[in-house]
Amino acid sequence: MAKVNAREARIVRHERLRKKVSGTEARPRLCVFRSIENIYTQVINDNCGSTLVQASTKDAELKAELDGKTKTEQAVVIGNLIAKRSLEAGISEVVFDRGGYKYHGRVKALAEAARSGGLKF
């Protein structure tokens, strides 16, 4: 039997997680994707399949603020930004979708920053 690599294992974990976690209009899903250099977040309403709010380290307005920070510090900035944008859009409660990643490091830093920014999980 072939050995499963880390990426495939994460995808399997994410599929298993998605069976249990679904976003609604009242409580959308905060989805996290972590790449080698960047981190992306979206607030998604799964009933109609639309992205309500998004934030990532590739946002042009954050370029100067993120320069020289570690990836974990950048995740904190993104967590605060997604919380601010969500509250402006009238979203105060979300379901957290960690994307198959361990709740550790950048994912944990983003989640805690979003909580401190005013989002309820």
Curated annotation (Swiss-Prot):
HAMAP family: Ribosomal_uL18_B. It comes from the Bacteria. GO terms for molecular function: 5S rRNA binding; structural constituent of ribosome. Keywords: Ribonucleoprotein, Ribosomal protein, RNA-binding, rRNA-binding. One of its GO terms (biological process) is translation. Belongs to the universal ribosomal protein uL18 family. Signal peptide: none annotated. It holds the Pfam family Ribosomal_L18p. Part of the 50S ribosomal subunit; part of the 5S rRNA/L5/L18/L25 subcomplex. Contacts the 5S and 23S rRNAs. This is one of the proteins that bind and probably mediate the attachment of the 5S RNA into the large ribosomal subunit, where it forms part of the central protuberance. The keyword rRNA-binding applies. InterPro entries: Ribosomal_uL18_bac-type (IPR004389), Ribosomal_uL18_bac/euk (IPR005484). This is Large ribosomal subunit protein uL18. GO terms for cellular component: cytoplasm; ribonucleoprotein complex; ribosome.
